[in-house]
């Protein structure tokens, strides 16, 4: 978006990425100070918005998801995908954080290196459970997928701690679409939402990148190359190409036997947690990432997360995987 002043064109921050509960010049209670929120959200979204507008004239007309999908297969438009993905990830993660009743981070002493040696207390009572906010369906799905809420919480936090730079930890729902349901004589698509997963993405990666077709193609290539290499190492150089073809056939057969045949799989994001030091360094310091994540947990608005859980989820399917 451009605003003209005299002969100069000044880029104005687009409010299309604004979140109602985040106010510039105000803190996010219990999670970010005024300065912390400015650096974690406002400065970054303004920068990314300006960069995206510099790359394409469609940034103000199309949703971020559309920009990501339409440009993801073009190497020359990778920069558009990166900026759009980064904006999407940042907005998605902040949209679920409503703050908490903890002491403001700027009023707490900075943690030192001893924080790295702290052992998590697995006997502690979990605060901010989805059940306590009336989100029974989400809590049931979490327990069915991860065993218990404590296991889910531990995996979520530890997964984020494992990211040393920019990235996000996601809670996603796996959606399976039966290709046969796309025939003209079967107008109602058979969509199944069978399980929840936690995954990490790095830099500008998004859950949209995790599709069964892409993963299976990559695994297929790896399997074929491995078999081809084995043939070469065994001295059967002339047979290596034939071995590769046989390996591909074997891979396809085994994949079909394991139930992947006829299924398109995608992942629906429900929750994202930002791991970037830009988010937590200002308020929590070098050794405060775990403290930041503990407060993120207490700040999650589970009603928003549950609203993203597909209504057609087959709860009974959670117990079979």
UniProtKB/Swiss-Prot annotation:
InterPro entries: SOD_C_sf (IPR036314). Keywords: Mitochondrion, Ribonucleoprotein, Ribosomal protein, Transit peptide. Residues 1-13 form a transit peptide. GO terms for cellular component: cytoplasm; mitochondrial inner membrane; mitochondrial small ribosomal subunit; mitochondrion. Its main location: mitochondrion. One of its GO terms (molecular function) is structural constituent of ribosome. SUPFAM superfamilies: Fe,Mn superoxide dismutase (SOD), C-terminal domain. It is found in: Mitochondrion. The keyword Mitochondrion applies. One of its GO terms (biological process) is mitochondrial translation. Component of the mitochondrial ribosome (mitoribosome), a dedicated translation machinery responsible for the synthesis of mitochondrial genome-encoded proteins, including at least some of the essential transmembrane subunits of the mitochondrial respiratory chain. The mitoribosomes are attached to the mitochondrial inner membrane and translation products are cotranslationally integrated into the membrane. Component of the mitochondrial small ribosomal subunit (mt-SSU). Mature yeast 74S mitochondrial ribosomes consist of a small (37S) and a large (54S) subunit. The 37S small subunit contains a 15S ribosomal RNA (15S mt-rRNA) and 34 different proteins. The 54S large subunit contains a 21S rRNA (21S mt-rRNA) and 46 different proteins. mS43 forms a heterodimer with mS42, building a large protuberance adjacent to the mRNA channel exit in the mt-SSU body. Present with 2840 molecules/cell in log phase SD medium. Belongs to the mitochondrion-specific ribosomal protein mS43 family. This is Small ribosomal subunit protein mS43. It comes from Saccharomyces cerevisiae (strain ATCC 204508 / S288c).
């Amino acid at each position: 978006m451009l605003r003209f002043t005299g002969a100069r064109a000044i880029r104005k921050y687009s409010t299309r990425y604004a979140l109602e509960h985040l106010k510039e010049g105000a803190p996010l209670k219990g999670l970010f100070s005024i300065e912390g929120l400015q650096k974690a959200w406002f400065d970054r979204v303004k920068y990314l918005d300006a960069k995206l507008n510099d790359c394409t004239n469609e940034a103000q007309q199309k949703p971020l998801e559309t920009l990501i999908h339409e440009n993801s297969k073009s190497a020359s438009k990778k920069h558009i995908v990166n900026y759009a993905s980064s904006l999407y990830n940042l907005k998605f993660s902040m949209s679920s954080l409503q703050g908490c009743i903890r002491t403001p981070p700027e009023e707490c002493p900075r943690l030192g290196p001893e924080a790295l040696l702290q052992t998590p207390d697995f006997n502690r009572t979990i605060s901010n459970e989805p059940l306590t906010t009336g989100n029974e369906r989400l809590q049931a799905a979490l327990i069915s997928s991860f065993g218990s809420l404590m296991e889910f919480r531990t995996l979520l936090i530890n997964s984020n701690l494992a990211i040393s730079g920019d990235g996000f930890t996601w809670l996603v729902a796996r959606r399976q679409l039966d290709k046969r349901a796309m025939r003209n004589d079967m107008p109602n698509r058979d969509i199944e939402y069978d399980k929840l997963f936690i995954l990490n993405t790095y830099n500008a990666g998004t859950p949209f990148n995790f599709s069964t077709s892409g993963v299976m193609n990559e695994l297929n290539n790896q399997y074929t190359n491995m078999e081809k290499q084995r043939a070469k190492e065994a001295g059967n150089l002339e047979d290596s190409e034939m071995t590769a073809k046989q390996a591909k056939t074997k891979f396809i057969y085994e994949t079909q036997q394991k139930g992947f045949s006829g299924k398109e799989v995608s992942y629906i994001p429900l929750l994202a947690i930002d791991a970037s030091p830009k988010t937590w360094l200002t308020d929590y310091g070098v050794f405060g990432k775990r403290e930041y994540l503990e407060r993120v947990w207490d700040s999650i608005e589970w009603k928003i997360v549950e609203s993203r859980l597909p209504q057609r989820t087959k709860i009974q399917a959670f117990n079979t995987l």
